[in-house]
C-alpha cells in the first residue's frame, strides 16, 4: 500500500481511451473520468460547457513519477492537434495538463519542451497547462468504459518504440 499518493488531471481527447491505457501503468492506484478546465458547475456529458473530457489519476510517485506519467500521456495522444483527437473534434477533446502544484507545473512545462524538441510529433505541442480546478466526475456509464465494452470506441494507442528524449539544457 502506498504511503503517499499524488493526483494528476490530464485531458487528451475522449476520456474512455485515456483511462483504459493510463490505469494499466504500474503505480497508478485509481482513475476516474470527468470534466475539468471549464466554466460549468456540476458538469455532465450533456452539459459540460467549455470543460475538457479529463481523467483524474491517483498514483504512487515512488513507483511512477509525474514525469513518466506525462511521457506516457504524450505517447498515447497527439498533443499537436488543437481541440481534436482522431475523429473527435471540439473543445472537449483538447490536450491539457491541469497541475496541482508548482512542481507539477514545472515538470509539465519541461516535458512539453522535450516533446517539442524531440520531433516525435509533426507539429508544435498545443497542450494547455493550467491550474487544476474543479473536477466533475462523469456519469457511471463512462467510468471504465472500455473495460465494460472492450471493442468500444477509442482513438488512443501506445506507439511502439516511442521514447521521449530529454533535450540538452542551456547552460546558465
From Swiss-Prot:
Organism of origin: Mesorhizobium japonicum (strain LMG 29417 / CECT 9101 / MAFF 303099) (Mesorhizobium loti (strain MAFF 303099))
Name of the gene encoding the protein in the UniProt record: msrA1
Active site residues of this protein: 14
GO terms of biological process kind: protein modification process
Role of this protein: Has an important function as a repair enzyme for proteins that have been inactivated by oxidation. Catalyzes the reversible oxidation-reduction of methionine sulfoxide in proteins to methionine.
Sequence similarity: Belongs to the MsrA Met sulfoxide reductase family.
HAMAP family: MsrA
Residues forming coiled coils: none
UniProt entry tagged with the keyword Oxidoreductase: yes
Alphabetical UniProt keywords: Oxidoreductase
Catalytic activity annotation: L-methionyl-[protein] + [thioredoxin]-disulfide + H2O = L-methionyl-(S)-S-oxide-[protein] + [thioredoxin]-dithiol; [thioredoxin]-disulfide + L-methionine + H2O = L-methionine (S)-S-oxide + [thioredoxin]-dithiol
Uppermost EC category: oxidoreductase
EC numbers: 1.8.4.11
MF GO annotations: L-methionine:thioredoxin-disulfide S-oxidoreductase activity; peptide-methionine (S)-S-oxide reductase activity
Protein's UniProt name: Peptide methionine sulfoxide reductase MsrA 1
Amino acid at each position: 500500500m502506498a504511503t503517499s499518493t499524488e493526483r494528476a488531471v490530464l485531458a487528451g481527447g475522449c476520456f474512455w481511451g485515456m483511462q483504459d491505457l493510463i490505469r494499466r501503468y504500474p503505480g497508478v492506484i485509481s482513475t476516474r473520468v470527468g470534466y475539468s478546465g471549464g466554466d460549468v458547475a456540476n458538469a455532465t456529458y450533456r452539459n459540460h460547457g467549455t470543460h475538457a473530457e479529463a481523467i483524474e489519476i491517483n498514483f504512487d510517485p515512488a513507483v511512477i513519477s509525474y514525469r513518466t506519467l506525462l511521457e506516457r500521456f504524450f505517447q498515447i495522444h497527439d498533443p499537436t492537434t488543437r481541440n481534436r483527437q482522431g475523429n473527435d473534434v471540439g473543445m472537449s477533446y483538447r490536450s491539457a495538463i491541469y497541475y496541482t502544484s508548482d512542481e507539477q507545473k514545472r515538470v509539465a512545462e519541461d516535458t512539453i519542451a522535450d516533446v517539442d524538441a524531440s520531433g516525435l510529433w509533426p507539429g508544435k505541442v498545443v497542450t494547455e497547462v493550467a491550474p487544476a480546478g474543479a473536477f466533475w466526475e462523469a456519469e457511471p456509464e463512462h467510468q471504465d468504459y472500455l473495460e465494460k465494452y472492450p471493442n468500444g470506441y477509442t482513438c488512443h494507442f501506445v506507439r511502439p518504440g516511442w521514447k521521449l528524449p530529454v533535450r540538452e539544457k542551456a547552460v546558465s
